């Protein structure tokens, strides 16, 4: 597992300097508002088995008065749609958020055009299972070719295998509970 984490870290460091500087100036307010989560790459143990049953999720991003990131999400669960609120604290270095007390070790934006899509990297640890994800956030119900291409590029670049990647099912029922 340490080798995978090192590979992911090296891939993040290998980002072209111009792009890394560009994202360093990212204003969190540009990420605010409603998003559809259309694709996911995950190293979670059960993801490869469950990925074909996962539906599009909805996320509404807001900032707290303390400049923490608040994520309201709605996704399909075992008993229908479930909603949750996650608050992430801003780190001092760069545009990175975290909340280790709930298992979110890092959340950062890998790529975005500020209007249509964002590629989000998250390092998580639940129980004794550390893993990371890459998610494609989209302002629309369908992703652009540019967004899908970047999602695929980042996922592969960070070492995700094809069975660890999924375009989510187009059932928007749960997403629309908070996005409509």
From Swiss-Prot:
Job description of the protein: May play a role in male fertility.
Pfam families cross-referenced by the UniProt entry: Lipocalin (PF00061)
PROSITE patterns: LIPOCALIN
UniProt family annotation: Belongs to the calycin superfamily. Lipocalin family.
GO cellular component assignments: extracellular region
Main localization (coarse): secreted
Protein's name in the database: Epididymal-specific lipocalin-6
S-S pairs: 81-174
Localization per record: Secreted
GO molecular function, one term: small molecule binding
Keyword annotations: Disulfide bond, Fertilization, Secreted, Signal
Superkingdom as given in the UniProt entry: Eukaryota
Signal peptide positions on this chain: 1-20
Single biological process term from Gene Ontology: single fertilization
InterPro entries: Calycin (IPR012674), Lipocalin (IPR002345), Lipocalin_CS (IPR022272), Lipocln_cytosolic_FA-bd_dom (IPR000566)
Species the sequence originates in: Macaca mulatta (Rhesus macaque)
